[in-house]
Amino acid sequence: MEIRWLGHACFTITHNGYTLVIDPYHSDYVTGYPKLRGVKADKLLISHDSYGHNYREGVVLSGRPESDCPFSITPMEVWHDTVCGIMRGSCLVHLIEADGIRAAHLGDIGAPLTGEQAGKLYNLDAMMVTAGSCTALPSQEVFRLTEELFPRVIIPMHYRDGNRGPRRLEHVEELTKHYAPDMVKIYDTDRITITCDMEPQIAVLRFQGLPPEPPAAPGKKASTLSRISSKMPFFRRR
């Protein structure tokens, strides 16, 4: 299973030639990143409807039938805040499994898991989790969560990366400082291949740009309405 980080909380997850994309972002609201355009995938997953996570227009789906999907995908509803959703509602954690590999994308999780949810997410091969923010769990709570769930590979996401990402997010070092230094592995690439026997680690991937945009169909232009609506700030939560 290959996991590629496209910035913020967006990843592609590929297995046996089939690709999921999760949480595509609108660059008007996740500043510093280039605009997502024409990211190719076979299936789209979204943790919650905010512009930092739901930019469907940036994804081109293949149209392959569900029967082609090699993944078992289990969504779990969690709170996006510490007050039972009063401030930010809920979001989805996605448990993604294929050929014995278990990975999870925790979205903007903002509160502890239930016992049942924790049981389903225990001892994952890979966990994509926020590095800490005021709109999700802070870094100290993320560390406690990973200590409880014991994932083999922790992939930080949703953090301030240089001049990329919302300023209110924490930097990745605010999370990695809680772990032994020899556990933290800084990658020179934006992707990692997950296996059942890889060494435990905090895998900090490096943003390396976005996939090239596919060429537009000859003579086809976006309508004025679609161009305007893509910029309208209906929902600003990240």
Which residue ranges define each predicted feature?
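Conserved acidic residues
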Residues: D42, D125, R152
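Binuclear metal-ion centers of metallo-dependent hydrolases, dominated by the metallo-beta-lactamase
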Residues: R4-L6, M87-R88, V153-R238
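Active-site-proximal beta-strand elements of phosphoester/diester hydrolases
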Residues: E2-W5, T19-D23, S72-V78, V93-L95, ...
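Metallo-beta-lactamase
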Residues: G52-G100, A180-E199
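Active-site-proximal loop/helix segments of hydrolase catalytic cores
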Residues: V83-L149
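Pre-active-site segment of Zn-dependent metallo-hydrolases
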Residues: C10-I46, S50-R64, T74-G89, I109-K120
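A short helix->loop->beta-strand "cap" motif at the edges of active sites that frequently abuts
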Residues: Y18, L149-V153
